C-alpha cells in the first residue's frame, strides 16, 4: 500500500542535479514566455463562461493537463488563480501588492514569487536529503512491519504485500511523466481510501495494524524541478466573482484540511509506535525481495483478535495466555462423542459349537469342566468348552503355528473354556494360575478378529490392543503374537516407557494390527501431536493382561482414560492370576455382561511345581549360611546334568541383588541381575542373555519385577533367597517355573524370626495340598495367635481383601447364584447403617461421649445395638485449635482424637486400611493419621503420654470438615460391627431362592 504524503520534499528524486544555473535560466525564460502567451489568450477570450479545473486527474500524466488548457478561458482563470495563491501565502508583502489590478504588475509579481518558492524548495529539499532517513522513517512510518534503507539516496515505497510475513519494503520504481500538485493531492486521497480498505481486511488476521504506508510514486518528468514548475501551473485555479471580483481560495482550504489530516495521521502513528516498542521485534535481512533494503524489522506475533492499542493490560493478558498454553504439558486426551460417530460394523462371533459338545446336557458339561482342572464358569449362556484344536475350525495358517511352532498337542484347561467364550464375542474375566496358557487364550481370538477385518490405514490405529503392567510382560506378549506373523500379514508395535518414542511413532504412522503397550506410554502416544499420531477408533478387541497387578501399580485412572477413546461396542477380555475386590469393581465398569471363569484355585501354586522350605536359625552368620546353601543348590543342580537349565533367584531389595551377583561371580558362577533400578536397555540385555541357551549365563538374580510376565524356556528352578511378603507374590515367583505342563522346582529360604512370611508359605503349601513341616506349622500357629490377640496384622497382599470374598463365593453355592442373577442386594445393610447413623448423637458437648442407641424400631438396629453393647465406643470430641502432635506451618484449626485401640480386630482393620482412609480424606478434605501404640486387651503395659493407645488424629481447617470425617469413620465402625454380627449369626441356607 502507499503512504500518504505529508512532506512534499520527500517525493523528489535526489539523483538529479539541481544546482545547474543554465538549466534554471532556460526554464525561467520558458516559464515567462508561457505566462505571456497565456495572458494574451486570456485577454482575447470569449464570453464569461467559467469552468472549474479538473482536480481528479491523478496519475493521468502531462497529456491530460495539456488537454485541459485548450480553452482560453481556462488559461486565464489559471493565471489569475496562481496570482491569488501566491498573493495569499506571502507573509512579507503589503496589502497593496495583493490588490494590484494591472495584469502586467500581476505577471511581474508572479514571476518574482515563483523564484522565491523555487529557492525555498531547494533549501528544504537539501535539509531533508541530509537528514537521517531511518530515524525519520521510524517517526513517520512507525507501524509493525517496516523496511528501512540505510542509503543516503532513497527510493519511494511500492506496495508489496506478503500474506505470510507481511513485510513492506521501499523500492526504486518511478512512473513516467510529471505530476502536479492536484495529482498529488488526489493521489493522497485515493491512497488513504485504499489504506482504509486494506486495514479493514487485514484487521482480522493480525494484531498489529501494520500494513506499512508508503508515499505515492510521482510519474517521472524531465527532473524534479520540472515537476515542481508544472505543479505550480496546474495545481492552482482562479475564480472570478461577477459582483466584485472577489477571490475564493478553495485550494488553500483544501491544503489546510490535508495538513490537519496529515498531523492526525502522524499522531496515530506515534501512538502505534509506542505500543509496538513494548512488543518483541525480530531483525532479518531481506536481500532476495528488495536489493535496496538492508534491514527489515519484523513483528512476528500474530494474534487472532484485534487489540485495543490504548489498553496495555489487554496485551499482557494475551501474552500470558499464550505462555500458559505453551507451558501446559499435561497429557490430556480429547473427549470423543461416540454417539455422533458412525462406526463400521464388525463381526465378533466366530465360534461354532462342536457336535460332540452340542449333544451334552448341562450336567455333563459340568462334569467335563470338573475334569478340566475344576474349571468354574459363571454367567448366562456360557459356551461349552472344546477338547482338541481341530474343533475350533481355525485357518490352516493359525493351526500350523500352534502345532509346529508352539508345540501344543492339546489345549490347556483355561484355553478349553476361555477360547470358546472369547470367539463367541462375549466379554470375559479369566482367573487362572500362572503358566496355565492365558496368553494364547486371547491371542488366538484376537488373530481371528484381525483376519476378518481390513488392514488399518496409516493413522487409523490398531484393531487389537493389549495392555500390560510392566515392560517385560509387554515384550513377552509381543514375542508370542509375532509367532503368528510368519504365516499372515500381522504387524505388532510394542510401546513402553524407557525406550525411544520416535521409533514407536514411526511404526504407528505406517499402520499396525496390534499394539502391546503399558498404559502410560499409550497415553503419551495418543496425546502426541494433538492426537494425530494414532487413534483407537478402529480398535475392536481389548485385553487387560495381569489386570490385578495393573491396578495395584495405580494404573486405574490411565485405563479408564484409555477406554474413553475406544468405541463402546468393543470386546474386552480381562486376565489375571488373582481377583481382588477393587478389580471386580472396575470390571463391572469396563465389561458388559461378562462371563467369569476360574481355573483351579486363585493364588494356588501349580501341581507341576515341587515346593521346598528351608528354615535357618537367626544368627550372626545367617547371610553366610544362606549364601553357602545357595551355592550348594546351584552346584547340585548343574552337576545333575541339567547344564541347559536356568535358575532364577529372587531377593527383596535392589542392593541385595547387586551384592549377590558380586558374591556369585567371585565364586565363578556366571550370573546377571535385573531390577527396577537398572535402565531399560540393561534390563533387556539381561533378559536376552539369560534366555539365550548359548550365552553361558544360566543364573538370573532379580527382585519381584521378574515375578510376572517372564517366560524363559528351560527355567527349571526358582530360589527365593528372601521370602515374599504376601501370598500372591509367592505364587507368581514360583510360577516362573513349571510352565506349559512342565515340571519345576521352587526353594524358599526363611529364618525363625520371619513368622509372617512362614505363615504365608504354610498357607500356600496347604492350598496346594502339600505336606507341612512341624516346625513351620508351629511358627505359623504362634503367629496366628498374635493376630487374634491384635499383636500382629495379617498381610493384605496386592490389596487382596477381595480374595477371601472370592473364596467364600466359590464355596457357597447360594452366593454364587445370587451374584450370577443379580439378586444380591447390599442396600439393606447400608440402610441399617444409615438408620443407626441418624439415631446416634455424633457431636455432643466436649465432655460427653457418643454411644449407640439402646433401642430401635427395626430388628437390624436392635441386633446391632446388642452386639455393640459390649464394645466401648470411642468418643468424637472436636477441639478448636492446633493439635500438639502437629508442628510446622501446616497446622489446622480443628482436630479430633478417636481411640481405636480397644475396638475388635476386624472393626479396627476396616478403619485403618489405606483405601478406607484415602476415601475419607478425599471426601472430607481433612488429614487423618494413625498415632500411638497398640496395647492388647490383656497387656500389662500401661499407656503413657509419650506412647498413648492407638488412635486416629483428624485435623481440618473447619469444624464441618472434621465432623464429616468423624461421621464417615463412625459409619465404618458400624459396618464392621454389622459384619461381625452377620458372621456370628449366619445360618445355613439352601441352594435355591424362591
Curated annotation (Swiss-Prot):
A motif (DEAD box) lies at residues 545-548. GO terms for molecular function: ATP binding; ATP hydrolysis activity; nucleic acid binding; RNA helicase activity. It catalyses: ATP + H2O = ADP + phosphate + H(+). Residues 1-105, 170-190, 235-275, 842-867 are annotated as: Disordered. ATP binds at residues 432-439. It holds the Pfam family DEAD. Residues 419-597 form the Helicase ATP-binding domain. GO terms for biological process: mRNA processing; RNA splicing. Its EC number is 3.6.4.13. Residues 1-18, 84-102, 235-245 have a biased composition (Polar residues). Keywords: ATP-binding, Coiled coil, Helicase, Hydrolase, mRNA processing, mRNA splicing, Nucleotide-binding, Nucleus. The Q motif is unique to and characteristic of the DEAD box family of RNA helicases and controls ATP binding and hydrolysis. Belongs to the DEAD box helicase family. DDX46/PRP5 subfamily. ATP-dependent RNA helicase involved spliceosome assembly and in nuclear splicing. Catalyzes an ATP-dependent conformational change of U2 snRNP. Bridges U1 and U2 snRNPs and enables stable U2 snRNP association with intron RNA. This is Pre-mRNA-processing ATP-dependent RNA helicase PRP5. It comes from Lodderomyces elongisporus (strain ATCC 11503 / CBS 2605 / JCM 1781 / NBRC 1676 / NRRL YB-4239) (Yeast). The gene is PRP5.
Amino acid at each position: 500500500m502507499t503512504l500518504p504524503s505529508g512532506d512534499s520534499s520527500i517525493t523528489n528524486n535526489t539523483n538529479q542535479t539541481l544546482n545547474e544555473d543554465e538549466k534554471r535560466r532556460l526554464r525561467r525564460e520558458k516559464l515567462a514566455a508561457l505566462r505571456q502567451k497565456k495572458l494574451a489568450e486570456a485577454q482575447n477570450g470569449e464570453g464569461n463562461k467559467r469552468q472549474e479545473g479538473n482536480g481528479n486527474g491523478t496519475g493521468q500524466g502531462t497529456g491530460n493537463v495539456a488537454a485541459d488548457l485548450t480553452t482560453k478561458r481556462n488559461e486565464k482563470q489559471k493565471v489569475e488563480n496562481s496570482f491569488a495563491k501566491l498573493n495569499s501565502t506571502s507573509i512579507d508583502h503589503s496589502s497593496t501588492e495583493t490588490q494590484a489590478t494591472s495584469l502586467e504588475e500581476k505577471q511581474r509579481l508572479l514571476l518574482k514569487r515563483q523564484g522565491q518558492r523555487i529557492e525555498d524548495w531547494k533549501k528544504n529539499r537539501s535539509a531533508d536529503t541530509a537528514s537521517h532517513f531511518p530515524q525519520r522513517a521510524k517517526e513517520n512510518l512507525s507501524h509493525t512491519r517496516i523496511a528501512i534503507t540505510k542509503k543516503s539516496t532513497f527510493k519511494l515505497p511500492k506496495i508489496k504485500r506478503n500474506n505470510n510475513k507481511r513485510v513492506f519494503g521501499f523500492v526504486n520504481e518511478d512512473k513516467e511523466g510529471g505530476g502536479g500538485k492536484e495529482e498529488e493531492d488526489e493521489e493522497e486521497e485515493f491512497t488513504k481510501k485504499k489504506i482504509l480498505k486494506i486495514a479493514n481486511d487485514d484487521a482480522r488476521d493480525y494484531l498489529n495494524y501494520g500494513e506499512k504506508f508508503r508515499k505515492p510514486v510521482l510519474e517521472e518528468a524531465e527532473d524534479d524541478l520540472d515537476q515542481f514548475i508544472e505543479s505550480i501551473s496546474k495545481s492552482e485555479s482562479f475564480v472570478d466573482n461577477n459582483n466584485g471580483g472577489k477571490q475564493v481560495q478553495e485550494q488553500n482550504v483544501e491544503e489546510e484540511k490535508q495538513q490537519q489530516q496529515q498531523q492526525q495521521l502522524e499522531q496515530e502513528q506515534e501512538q502505534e509506535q509506542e505500543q509496538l516498542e513494548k512488543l518483541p521485534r525480530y531483525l532479518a535481512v531481506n536481500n532476495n525481495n528488495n536489493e535496496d533494503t538492508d534491514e527489515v524489522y519484523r513483528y512476528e506475533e500474530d494474534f487472532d483478535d484485534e487489540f485495543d492499542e490504548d489498553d496495555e493490560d489487554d496485551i499482557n493478558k494475551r501474552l500470558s495466555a499464550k505462555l500458559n498454553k505453551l507451558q501446559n504439558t499435561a497429557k490430556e486426551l480429547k473427549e470423543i462423542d461416540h454417539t455422533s460417530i458412525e462406526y463400521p460394523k464388525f463381526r465378533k462371533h466366530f465360534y461354532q459349537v462342536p457336535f460332540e459338545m452340542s449333544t451334552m446336557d448341562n450336567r455333563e458339561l459340568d462334569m467335563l469342566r470338573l475334569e478340566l482342572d475344576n474349571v468354574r464358569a459363571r454367567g448366562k449362556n456360557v459356551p461349552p468348552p472344546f477338547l482338541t484344536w481341530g474343533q475350533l475350525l481355525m485357518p490352516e495358517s493359525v493351526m500350523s503355528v500352534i502345532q509346529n511352532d508352539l508345540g501344543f498337542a492339546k489345549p490347556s484347561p483355561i484355553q478349553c473354556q476361555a477360547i470358546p467364550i472369547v470367539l463367541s464375542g462375549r466379554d470375559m474375566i479369566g482367573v487362572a494360575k500362572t503358566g496355565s496358557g492365558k496368553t494364547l487364550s486371547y491371542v488366538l481370538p484376537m488373530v481371528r478378529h484381525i483376519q476378518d477385518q481390513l488392514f488399518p490405514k496409516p493413522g487409523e490405529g490398531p484393531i487389537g490392543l493389549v495392555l500390560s503392567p510392566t515392560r517385560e510382560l509387554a515384550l513377552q506378549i509381543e514375542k508370542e503374537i509375532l509367532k503368528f506373523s510368519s504365516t499372515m500379514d500381522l504387524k505388532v508395535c510394542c510401546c513402553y516407557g524407557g525406550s525411544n518414542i520416535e521409533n514407536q511413532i514411526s511404526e504407528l504412522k505406517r499402520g499396525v494390527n496390534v499394539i502391546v503397550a503399558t498404559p502410560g506410554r499409550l497415553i503419551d502416544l495418543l496425546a502426541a501431536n494433538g492426537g494425530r499420531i494414532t487413534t483407537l477408533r478402529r480398535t475392536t478387541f481389548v485385553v487387560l493382561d495381569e489386570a490385578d497387578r495393573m491396578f495395584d501399580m495405580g494404573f486405574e485412572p490411565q485405563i479408564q482414560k484409555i477406554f474413553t477413546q475406544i468405541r463402546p461396542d468393543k470386546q474386552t477380555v480381562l486376565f489375571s492370576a488373582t481377583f481382588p475386590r477393587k478389580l471386580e469393581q472396575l470390571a463391572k465398569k469396563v465389561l458388559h455382561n461378562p462371563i467369569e471363569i476360574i481355573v483351579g484355585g486363585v493364588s494356588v501354586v501349580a501341581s507341576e511345581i515341587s515346593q521346598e522350605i528351608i528354615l535357618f536359625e537367626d544368627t550372626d552368620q545367617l547371610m553366610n549360611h544362606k549364601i553357602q546353601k545357595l551355592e550348594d543348590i546351584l552346584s547340585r543342580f548343574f552337576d545333575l546334568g541339567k547344564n541347559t537349565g536356568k535358575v532364577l533367584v529372587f531377593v527383596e531389595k535392589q542392593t541385595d541383588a547387586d551384592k549377590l551377583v558380586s558374591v556369585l561371580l567371585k565364586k565363578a558362577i556366571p550370573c546377571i541381575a535385573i531390577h527396577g533400578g537398572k535402565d531399560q536397555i540393561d534390563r533387556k540385555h539381561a533378559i536376552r542373555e539369560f534366555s539365550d541357551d548359548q550365552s553361558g549365563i544360566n543364573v538370573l538374580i532379580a527382585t519381584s519385577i521378574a515375578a510376572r510376565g517372564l517366560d524363559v524356556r528351560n527355567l527349571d528352578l526358582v530360589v527365593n533367597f528372601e521370602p515374599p511378603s504376601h501370598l500372591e507374590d509367592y505364587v507368581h515367583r514360583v510360577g516362573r517355573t513349571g510352565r506349559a505342563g512342565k515340571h519345576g522346582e521352587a526353594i524358599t529360604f526363611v529364618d525363625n524370626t520371619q513368622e509372617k512370611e512362614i505363615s504365608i508359605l504354610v498357607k500356600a503349601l496347604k492350598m496346594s495340598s502339600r505336606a507341612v513341616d512341624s516346625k513351620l506349622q508351629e511358627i505359623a500357629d504362634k503367629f496366628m495367635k498374635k493376630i487374634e490377640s491384635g499383636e500382629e496384622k495379617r498381610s493384605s497382599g496386592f490389596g487382596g481383601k477381595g480374595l477371601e470374598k472370592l473364596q467364600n463365593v466359590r464355596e457357597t453355592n447360594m452366593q454364587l447364584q445370587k451374584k450370577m442373577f443379580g439378586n444380591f442386594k447390599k442396600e439393606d445393610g447400608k440402610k441399617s447403617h444409615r438408620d443407626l447413623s441418624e439415631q446416634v448423637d455424633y457431636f455432643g458437648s466436649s465432655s460427653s461421649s457418643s454411644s449407640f442407641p439402646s433401642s430401635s424400631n427395626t430388628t437390624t438396629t436392635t441386633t446391632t445395638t446388642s452386639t455393640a453393647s459390649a464394645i466401648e465406643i470411642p468418643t468424637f470430641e472436636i477441639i478448636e485449635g492446633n493439635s500438639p502432635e502437629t508442628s510446622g506451618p501446616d497446622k489446622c484449626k480443628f482436630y479430633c482424637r478417636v481411640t481405636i485401640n480397644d475396638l475388635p480386630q476386624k472393626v479396627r482393620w476396616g478403619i485403618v486400611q489405606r483405601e478406607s482412609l484415602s476415601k475419607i480424606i478425599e471426601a472430607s478434605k481433612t488429614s487423618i493419621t494413625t498415632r500411638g501404640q497398640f496395647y492388647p486387651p490383656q497387656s500389662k503395659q500401661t499407656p503413657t503420654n509419650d506412647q498413648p493407645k492407638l488412635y486416629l488424629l483428624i485435623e481440618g481447617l473447619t469444624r464441618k470438615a472434621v465432623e464429616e470425617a468423624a461421621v464417615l469413620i463412625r459409619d465404618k465402625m458400624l459396618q464392621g460391627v454389622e459384619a461381625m454380627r452377620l458372621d456370628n449369626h449366619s445360618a445355613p441356607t439352601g441352594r435355591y431362592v424362591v
